[in-house]
Amino acid sequence: MGRLRLPLVILVAVAAAGAATFLLRPRSGLIDPAPVDVEAYFTAFQLDRAEDYRSVQRLLGIGGLVVSTGTLALLAWRPPRGLFERLGRRPLLGAAAAGAGISVLLVMVGLPIDAWQRSRALDVGLATQSWPDWALDVVKSTAVGAGVAAVGGLLALVLVRRFRRNWWAPAAVVIVAFGVITIWLWPVVIDPIFNDFEKLPPGPVRQDVLGLADEAGVDVGEVYRVDASRRTTAANAYVGGLGHSKRVVLYDNLIAGFPRDEVRLVVAHELGHQKHNDLSRGLLWLALVAPAGTFFAQRLAEAFGRRYGLGDPAVKPGPIVLPAVALAVTLASLLLGSASNVLSRQVEARADAFALDLTQDPAAFVQFERRIALRNVIDPEPPWLTRFLFATHPTTMERIGIGEAWEKPE
């Protein structure tokens, strides 16, 4: 693996992510947002409230990322040798235990920040769930995460031991397969652990969904209502699943709290994702980037775990190398994720344009974007750096600009 220096490997991975984003970008159906004045849509009080809330939440989120990454770095640098020696007596079972244990540890070290963020969400009225119910959700999500991490730890050690110098190649295949399985099974296996889903009953909303789907020529799969209101006052909708698990999911507080014409626009936006196969587009991006990304992760992992035999063809590594692998995968994902977010913002903007074309209702579109920003306490114009690094959707003002541009084309 010494053939390529690490800086060159990083450059190749970043180039692969950028090339995949460029290749898969929407080539039509986008609308350049019209210039709009934020003060024409939001009062000074509303802007200050959103900034006060979101600025601290962003800092807490970044702090949580630093804490979790720092914890992995500490584990990779100074792993508890006695514990890992015991796990190494039965390497594969030990790897599963190590994966689960690392996952639980990361939840625990991040819990104070998560609780702080939730406390602030309660203060602004976004969170509705009691603390005991929230704690139960933490236990559930920790258990699910530990199970997934156990499988991940087991597979990682199998690949590292079997393909000592080139485990990045089969790892790329595993990551893509995991992405497909996750999108396919998560809506029917994991989501029901946390929420109750019911098929949207006959009525105006279901009629609108099916009518819009027919007009758009989209196989909508099934339409579900989820009891999101038991956790939050925020409203949302999303598409998920593949094949028989394909679905459109509407928050119950979206259906109950917004006018019918605005709900139609949200539905039309989600149909735009299905019309353009955006979930499959995301999987294709992953497939294109995974080889370079896992090669980058392997080089990082070998740098972190060399003293424990990682990268040495004469050594069969044990579970003690897993913190180094986890840290490397985390850093690679953070570096390459911004390119994925660029693509996500583009397909979201195209889905907005699709919704406007389908409903022909720009006034309702603009009103919805304003209303959802107020309800979800969204900063209409967040700082450009956090937007570039983390945002998966256009900003509120960009989306309002799309609506205004559609209504008044040049």
Short names for language-model regions:
Residues K316-A326:
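N-terminal signal-anchor/signal peptide hydrophobic helix marking the start
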Residues A16-A17:
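Flexible, low-complexity linker/boundary loops enriched in proline and small hydrophobic residues
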Residues R3-V9, T21-K316, T330-E410:
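Polar-ligand-bearing catalytic/cofactor-coordination segments
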